[in-house]
Amino acid sequence: MTSQLRVVSDDDNYTQQRVELAASFRWAARTDLHEAVANHFSLAVNEDGTKFLINPNQVHFSQIKASDLVLIDANDPHTMDRPDAPDPTAWGLHGGIHRHCPHARCVMHAHPEYGTVLASLKDSRLPPID
């Protein structure tokens, strides 16, 4: 992606950022990086990272459009009361990262098939093959 941080006014609808983030979801689906559920990408749109765009709940990566992305304020305690509230795990993970790491402009969280299997094993170490 070619986005560069830009400070915008609150009345800006972040069109370019929405387009580029939506494209990243579709590319993830196209390259099979969309397995399982509870996968989320978010993009900070203000300087301190507290306002960010995130994918809506229960929409497949291949179907996400720029207009589907939800604008969230990481400092708003009423986020989960909204009718378009994000998945609670997305809110907890991405909200925390954007609040505490403003330099993390884009956060991508997925559960690739083999990584999920490996993480589910009693002994998830993967020793080198000689």
Residue ranges and their predicted role:
Residues 1-130:
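Glycine-rich flexible loops
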